Amino acid sequence: MPILGLGTWQAPPGKVEKAIKLDYLDLYLIHFPMGFKVIPSNTDIRDTWEGMEDLVDAGLVKYTSLIEDPXVKKIADKYNKEYPFHVDY
């Protein structure tokens, strides 16, 4: 799978789907929701989660998931009201 969407930038609409040659993903996963070095960023994890929910609404993703971060799970529990998700750590 091509490395697209990693970091704090966004891929243009359609770029990922074209690169992986699929119409949708079964699972969109945030494995480790932070960088390995400190980079100033105003990106809020809630914005990231809402973007993932938008992908579910658009039919591009069936499920979302978080792994290895109990703090992110707390945020997802608070803000995720409509979509099932899985957290494993």
UniProtKB/Swiss-Prot annotation:
**Keywords from the named record:** Eye lens protein
Q: Which Pfam families match?
A: Aldo_ket_red
Q: What is the superkingdom listed in this entry's lineage?
A: Eukaryota
Q: Does Flavoprotein show up as a keyword for this record?
A: no
Residues annotated to bind substrate:
H31
Recorded GO molecular functions are: oxidoreductase activity; structural constituent of eye lens
InterPro entries referenced in this protein's UniProt entry, alphabetically: AKR, NADP_OxRdtase_dom, NADP_OxRdtase_dom_sf
Query: Subunit notes for this chain?
Result: Monomer.
Task: Report the sequence similarity comment from the record.
Answer: Belongs to the aldo/keto reductase family.
Q: What is this protein called?
A: Rho beta-crystallin
Q: Give the species.
A: Lepidodactylus lugubris
